[in-house]
């Protein structure tokens, strides 16, 4: 930037001299010349200073994609390819690998987070495996999808159901952070509360439901300050948060909700022990788009599941059937529609026993009371033994090959009838002779 190191001594000092590599035309900023050892040393020293002198817990590297691609934000013919003729910035790749290697060698417990908005492979994989060496990456795809979905009128959400399910197609390819960051609440985009459709009660319900969906979705979490207050105004670095809102009941209630939701997250190890692999997640229902609902399981390392059911419609769904992985008693552990959070107090409050009714590809199920614009979470408090099926039930479930097996008596009668017919035929021929 012009207020920083831009042409520090009157000409390119820290940046590339060639404008095809040294300038971001969309932003009007300069690009560090990462091929020069003195520039790399300067950046390494800055990173270490923040960690060692200011004791920062970690660093987030902004706009990583703009450094990895030589053609980022540039028209054809306005960028310079690498020595192999490609668009990858080989110097930036080497820089990130060396930076992360040096930092983790000195401080193995810090966070190195990449804001990388493309599908660049192995951002959070070890350098030894050809990765960039970060330990976390912002999930920009999830953020864009969810911010598009929450702004929609609930009627139109059924046509955009993939916005809340597609992220599971790649959720475990990197170590992701789900970011509701400052980028989404600036420049007239509206606050998180302001994005929600409906009246005030529906807006607050939407915040509670989508934040809980975020907590139960695989990946670490990041939320912009002020969201926990139900802030109406966008975030701005020149102003403080609107703390005065806590004098109003709806904002005190949403504040209480965030405290309770975060405490629940810490208590339920299934939500964070295995959020980097399919071992910790299992879809129950991902395609009920007409109802705007999804249901899934989260598993901890002891194979103890949570059942999560989300309803992103304003319709109260009584008698909603949900599949279960095994029989038992399932108790609600969190309800975003609780009165203490500003909700209507709908939803289950007592444990539910499973029944032998198949649902969602599971042999067991339960029927729940699913409030409008809410998320319900259940855990098994008492696991029942699996009931052995009777022989008659097994026989009823057997698939036949097209030939029905007859009872023994019927088989004997059929054989006797055939023998009688054969005797009559022989006798008739003898008479004719």
Where are these regions (language model features)?
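Core domains of carbohydrate- and sulfate-ester-processing enzymes
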Residues: 2-21, 152-168, 342-343
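Catalytic cores of secreted or luminal carbohydrate-active enzymes
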Residues: 249-271
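Substrate-binding/active-site clefts of carbohydrate-active enzymes
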Residues: 1-88
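A short, structured beta-strand-centered segment in the mid-to-C-terminal lobe
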Residues: 32-33, 37-40, 246-257
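Conserved alpha/beta catalytic core and glycan-binding cleft of carbohydrate-active enzymes
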Residues: 55-57, 72-238, 245, 266-322, ...
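C-terminal beta-strand-rich structural cap/linker in extracellular carbohydrate-active enzymes
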Residues: 350-389
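Acidic, Ser/Thr/Pro-rich beta/coil linker or hinge segments at domain junctions
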Residues: 336-358
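Intrinsically disordered, polybasic Lys/Arg-rich low-complexity tracts
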Residues: 386-433
């Amino acid at each position: 930037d012009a207020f920083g190191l831009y042409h520090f001594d009157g000409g390119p000092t820290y940046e590339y001299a060639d404008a095809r590599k040294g300038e971001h035309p969309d932003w009007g900023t300069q690009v560090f010349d990462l091929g020069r050892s003195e520039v790399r040393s300067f950046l390494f020293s800055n990173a270490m200073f923040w960690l060692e002198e200011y004791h920062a817990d970690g660093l987030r590297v902004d706009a990583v994609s703009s450094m990895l691609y030589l053609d980022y934000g540039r028209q054809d013919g306005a960028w310079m390819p690498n020595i192999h003729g490609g668009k990858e910035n080989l110097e930036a790749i080497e820089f990130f690998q060396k930076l992360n290697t040096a930092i983790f060698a000195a401080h193995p417990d810090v966070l190195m987070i990449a804001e990388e908005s493309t599908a660049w492979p192995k951002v959070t994989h070890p350098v030894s495996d050809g990765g960039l060496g970060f330990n976390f990456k912002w999930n920009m795809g999830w953020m864009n999808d969810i911010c598009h979905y929450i702004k929609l009128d609930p009627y139109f959400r059924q046509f955009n159901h993939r916005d809340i399910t597609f992220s599971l197609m790649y959720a475990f390819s990197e170590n992701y952070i789900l970011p509701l960051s400052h980028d989404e609440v600036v420049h007239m985009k509206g606050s998180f509360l302001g994005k929600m459709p409906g009246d005030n009660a529906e807006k607050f319900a939407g915040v509670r439901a989508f934040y809980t969906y975020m907590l139960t979705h695989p990946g670490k979490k990041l939320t912009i300050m002020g969201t926990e207050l139900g802030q109406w105004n966008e975030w701005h670095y020149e102003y403080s948060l609107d703390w005065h809102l806590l004098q109003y009941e709806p904002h005190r209630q949403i504040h209480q909700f965030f405290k309770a939701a975060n405490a629940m997250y810490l208590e339920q190890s299934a939500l964070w022990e295995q959020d980097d692999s399919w071992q910790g997640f299992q879809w129950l229902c991902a395609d009920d788009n007409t109802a705007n609902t999804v249901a899934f399981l989260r598993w901890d390392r002891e194979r103890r599941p949570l059942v999560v059911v989300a309803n992103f419609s304003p319709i109260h769904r009584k008698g909603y059937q949900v599949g279960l992985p095994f029989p038992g008693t399932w108790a609600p552990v969190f309800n975003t529609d609780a009165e203490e959070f500003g909700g209507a107090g709908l939803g289950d409050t007592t444990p539910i026993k499973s029944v032998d009714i198949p649902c969602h590809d599971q042999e067991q199920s339960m029927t729940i009371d699913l409030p409008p614009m809410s998320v319900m979470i259940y855990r098994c408090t008492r696991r029942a033994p699996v009931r052995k099926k009777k022989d008659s039930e097994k026989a009823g479930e057997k698939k036949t090959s097209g030939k029905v097996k007859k009872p023994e008596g019927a088989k004997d009668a059929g054989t006797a009838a055939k023998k009688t017919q054969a005797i009559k035929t022989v006798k008739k021929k003898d008479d004719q002779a």
